[in-house]
Amino acid sequence: MLFSYLLATLPLLANAALTYKGADISSVFIEEKAGVAYKNLAGETQALEAILTDNGVNSIRQRVWVKNGDYDLTYNVNLAKRVAATGASIYLDLHYSDDWADPKHQTTPDGWSTDDINTLADQIYQYTLSVCNTFAEEKINVEIVSIGNEITSGLLWPLGKTPNYENIARLLHSGAWGVKDSKLATKPKILIHLDNGWDWDQQKYFYDTALGTGLLTSDDFDMIGVSYYPFYNEKATLASLKTSLTNIQTTYGKEVAVVETNWPVKCSSPEFAFPADLKDIPFSVDGQVTFLQRLAETLTATKASGFFYWEPAWTKNAGLGSSCEDNLLVDYNTNQVRNSVKAFGQV
């Protein structure tokens, strides 16, 4: 009887192990403005965030840019209100830029200092504080705040560009305290995000060097987030990811999550070879399910917090910046979600 009971509860235990089964839907307002009306599995028109949460998504990631316009603070407050109505938690991804921030682009916002680190450190603090206080005033709870996006090469260039880790550490410290000093009643988890989550050497070098300056302390942040895209490097195996996530937690004592990932339904001419332990997964809707299941198994095995699927419904950008033609969980011809969306509720 006891053995049978344990077998019956194993799926429940696996589900409970993943705190976050999330998606980044930052582009949703732009899509809706372009006339896209999303359809659920039954073919009925429904808000994207509701479709996702109905299928097991429990957290939504939103990118925040500094300049007024798409992805600005007002854009994100309005999106967060819709997300909050579904019961999903909110994860703000502060790019600290007027445009895309990633390992190749970390452009300082217009009007922010590019020649004085004291001024820039105050600007990142004041901006972060203002963003968080705005959400507090709107009575919107925030679960996670990322102080930068894929900052492997630093943030707020040129002052915060590698190899100037003293400036990087100081800026991260200032950003973190913008969150800590805010009026948010429940303080969000503060997250630092690098790319190539499978590359332990890269992760270790960044954190050892930044923390080694003494200007960023372990108390400044709560989580480490990583991107995991299998189609950018043959070395990006699940085995390597497992090793890296395990080492991150053991070395730094931080909660860890895969905060960006996706899998293609079509990839005719991949720029890079796919990792060996993923080559058997087809480029298809079923393949998306298999990939997310294996990823979830890896995360559960390492006691990681969860994952966020990056832009599953950006129908005007189906390749999502990769060499694959289509990485979406939505059919861009019909705007209907694919059956793979059910994977969130199955992992």
From Swiss-Prot:
InterPro entries: Glyco_hydro_53, Glycoside_hydrolase_SF. Its main location: secreted. GO terms for molecular function: arabinogalactan endo-1,4-beta-galactosidase activity; glucosidase activity. GO terms for biological process: cell wall organization; pectin catabolic process. It catalyses: The enzyme specifically hydrolyzes (1->4)-beta-D-galactosidic linkages in type I arabinogalactans. SUPFAM superfamilies: (Trans)glycosidases. Keywords: Carbohydrate metabolism, Cell wall biogenesis/degradation, Glycosidase, Hydrolase, Polysaccharide degradation, Secreted, Signal. Its EC number is 3.2.1.89. It is found in: Secreted. GO terms for cellular component: extracellular region. The active site is at E150, E260. Pfam families: Glyco_hydro_53 (PF07745). Residues 1-16 form the signal peptide. Belongs to the glycosyl hydrolase 53 family. Endogalactanase involved in the degradation of plant cell wall polysaccharides, and more particularly of hairy regions of pectin. This is Probable arabinogalactan endo-beta-1,4-galactanase A. The gene is galA.
